[in-house]
Amino acid sequence: MATWANLGLQNSSSPLMEQLNFFHDHTVLILIMITVMITYVMGMLFFNKFTNRYLLHGQTIEIIWTILPAIILMFIAFPSLRLLYLLDEINSPLITLKAIGHQWYWSYEYSNFMNLEFDSYMIPTNELDLNGFRLLDVDNRIILPLNNQIRILVTATDVLHSWTVPSLGVKIDATPGRLNQTNFLINQSGLFFGQCSEICGANHSFMPIVIESIPMNYFIKWVSSQLN
């Protein structure tokens, strides 16, 4: 989850987020190399006494500054395209979860089970436990099994919303009249927090998302208790 004064990305809890972190570091490394090189070249230009008689016409340097950026962009584009395909790939999901955005709460339906659905509201600050997280805890958490492919279908009933859990690398728009989908796999047990990431009205900041990841045997017991 997000912590105070954290300048980096959240710790990854899914393979997709690990790949996103790697791509971020890869891109930042390239940007640092470009910045250092440009700073060095600009410094050399300003602090030397040489003159160039061919300043107005330099075909060689024009070829270099055309080809070199193209090569650099290829090193960024290919990993980016690979990630885009991974984010859209659906790999035989074990469970399908449907999230429906409302002003200003979420509804969830487990499509694999009959009559397993609930609404999820933020717990007000005056009703929060001492160990609760302000503006992040909900009355009904999403319970999902560990180390299994999960497909999520997202839509909305009124205005645009966005279902987002940063530590899982998931962000998908909830659009009225349209069903969007993505998949993810949680490789760590625990609680994962997110929020609506599309401004949707006065209480937009009061639409938290909480996922509780548990082993499969505990998930089966939870499903049985809910259905009974």
UniProtKB/Swiss-Prot annotation:
Names of required cofactors: Cu cation
Similarity field: Belongs to the cytochrome c oxidase subunit 2 family.
UniProt subcellular location: Mitochondrion inner membrane
GO molecular function annotations of the record: copper ion binding; cytochrome-c oxidase activity
Residues holding Cu cation A2: C196, E198, C200, H204
Residue ranges that the UniProt entry lists as topological domain Mitochondrial matrix: 49-62
Ranges that cross the membrane: 27-48, 63-82
Positions that bind Cu cation A1: H161, C196, C200, M207
Quaternary structure note: Component of the cytochrome c oxidase (complex IV, CIV), a multisubunit enzyme composed of a catalytic core of 3 subunits and several supernumerary subunits. The complex exists as a monomer or a dimer and forms supercomplexes (SCs) in the inner mitochondrial membrane with ubiquinol-cytochrome c oxidoreductase (cytochrome b-c1 complex, complex III, CIII).
Annotated S-S bridges: none
Annotated protein name in UniProt: Cytochrome c oxidase subunit 2
Primary localisation category: mitochondrion
Function: Component of the cytochrome c oxidase, the last enzyme in the mitochondrial electron transport chain which drives oxidative phosphorylation. The respiratory chain contains 3 multisubunit complexes succinate dehydrogenase (complex II, CII), ubiquinol-cytochrome c oxidoreductase (cytochrome b-c1 complex, complex III, CIII) and cytochrome c oxidase (complex IV, CIV), that cooperate to transfer electrons derived from NADH and succinate to molecular oxygen, creating an electrochemical gradient over the inner membrane that drives transmembrane transport and the ATP synthase.
Alphabetized UniProt keyword annotations: Copper, Electron transport, Magnesium, Membrane, Metal-binding, Mitochondrion, Mitochondrion inner membrane, Respiratory chain, Translocase, Transmembrane, Transmembrane helix, Transport
InterPro entries: CcO_II, CcO_II-like_C, CcO_II_C, Copper_CuA, Cupredoxin, Cyt_c_oxidase_su2, Cyt_c_oxidase_su2_TM_dom, Cyt_c_oxidase_su2_TM_sf
Note on how the cofactor is bound: Binds a dinuclear copper A center per subunit.
